[in-house]
């Protein structure tokens, strides 16, 4: 019997309900003007009923081709993010020990109504050196402590302190409703219009004060309490790509008397964990108790804050403060030292901000917190904050260098040098204007994270060179040795292309060190991996990506190098141990600097394999983690590899560098391939995406780039540890360069499941 329309709808809803009960959600997309809720409310009600039955709560009204494209991208992005869970970690020491605490961020989408919950756990390291990561055994969980705090500032228990930024008067302001005005016009009449329309134009049941209070943590207007706003299981939003930063007392490698006095004065300041979340805030949690000390809402997320209150947000997830904060010690213009937090929003926005966190205990009111906000920088050429800033001392002064990220207005690569105290632009470099032949202006581009290095070999010298990659495969070189920025010299040292001529995007920061023949041969080795994973389309991209090691002489190159100028090393697959562990072996073609300009390795073992995390150079070993994402947007998966590469040749070392078979020892018999004992270059890490490298040994070489900030290592020892060599400072007659051996450590990274 043919079903009536009503029966057909009933049948569909029954099927959708069954699928949802089985854990399969269905996204409902309407097509054409006929499903526009303003024109056809009956159709809208029908599609909404189907969406509720399907488990997503709302349908997508694709009333035109553009909306259809955007809706499909939103759906795929939600599905992709929903397959992830654990994000990143921080530790309270440079190596794991019994007294160490590991801080692990997390995001969950499987709570009630899939409300994009975040968490940050503090885990102990037990007497065996093992991290106990059971949530029930956590020292604290930030989601729980934040729920227990009072959303009203100054109230008990632990009222929240939240600030934001007013770009009209250029300073921080408390994120509070101004009770002195009766107008629903925002935080205060003078600043309301600058904080976005979400706080200015609402109907009676969605007014600005209710929205602001909701964002602060008031749950009275949530649907579960009779209101119209989205339900939240916990106040803390999902923490996806923001790496938590642990900050205790100042510890930069700086021996000046003024800095030593500053470090001594603040040596016992309470440790704090800083992390961004997709609830619109950067959070500062007390590292001992887990209580939120303060939160900051950067200007780059203003325009999307209103989406957080929508009951349909759970199926239309957005990023907010998704960048990784970092803290560095800065000497201000009055010669006083300050610890400054620098942060951005990652995929959530286009601003870069700075907060003075010298004394966390002083930021105990919203007025004090607002005064500590130094600046919040935006620019027409600043894109989404995928580029991490780096502080460096140059001949012209101390500046914060950053690439402009992606999806900027003009979609070109720019390098910024900002005053770290004021946020003022010291200089802005238009790279394509400097080298027009390097850019295809018809294709979107942007500058990734930069490194700022001292290529002299003298640890006391100024930083003089910037290296950064872009989406078109250019490895840029900016000589900043001249104190006059208009005299900085821009060039491209490498144009990364695969064997078919396809550009190889560079989305992670390069790393640099002195070349293997220094000091007899002057110049730097620069290493970079290629590949991107920024959107859904990247999942299915199978272009070959590569790892490059390029020699950069003091004068640079008149024309960019290409792969034809470099020595190729070829990968092969193999296995080690029982049960077999997949490893990679590599050729050992001769590379001699400066006759050869470097080397490259094509990542050919796994289709779609790419590098999206910055490499690490330690004691002559270049350590690179790669990933092969699953092309299925609905599935977890992907395979990661770790490569331990001889930085001088792009080949493997003559002895094993890692415990490939997992037996707890590094031996020729157990960790090489075949009867001829071929030393592997890399090992498969398993399913999932791995973060950057964490090394646990204490051998600290003199390496580039120079380190600035509390996370910097101590100076190198006068006698190197056993089996570890390091580069000596040029001109030091008592120091002889040692043989460079790789670190013998199996644990090289923390598990990170990410897009």
Label the predicted regions.
Residues 17-25, 30-32, 42-49, 55, ...:
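Beta-propeller fold recognition
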Residues 4-8, 64, 314:
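Residue-level preference for long, well-ordered alpha-helices that form the structural scaffold
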Residues 2-3, 36-41:
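Short, flexible/disordered intra-domain loops and linkers
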Residues 1-25:
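Exposed acidic/Ser/Thr-rich ligand/metal-binding surfaces
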